[in-house]
């Protein structure tokens, strides 16, 4: 189980929790979105809200995939491929949120 330190709250962020990575390091989903809301104020609030819902869905999907049990090598490969695809999508959404400006 991988474990990181959230750069906003300094608490641990571990496999099985909703967190992502920015250029600053690991960050809990809730910490990241709250920080961006505060930083942006009312500017880009609607766009942030939309992207936050997307990122939440992607991170939830990743957590659901972690619970899937596979018993064959093919199943494990397919699961790993799907996990990487969703992980990449979550990374792209995180970058879009990070790029939002006032």
List where the protein language model places each region.
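Intrinsically disordered, low-complexity regulatory segments
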Residues: 1-23, 29-102
């Amino acid at each position: 189980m991988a474990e990181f330190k959230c750069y906003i709250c300094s608490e641990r962020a571990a496999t099985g929790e909703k967190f992502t990575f920015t250029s600053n390091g690991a960050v809990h989903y809730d910490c990241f979105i709250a920080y961006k809301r505060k930083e942006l104020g009312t500017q880009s609030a609607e766009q942030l809200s939309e992207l936050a819902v997307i990122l939440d869905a992607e991170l939830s999907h990743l957590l659901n995939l972690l619970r899937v049990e596979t018993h064959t090598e093919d199943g494990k490969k397919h699961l790993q491929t799907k996990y990487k695809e969703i992980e990449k999508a979550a990374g792209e959404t995180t970058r879009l949120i990070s790029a939002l400006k006032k």
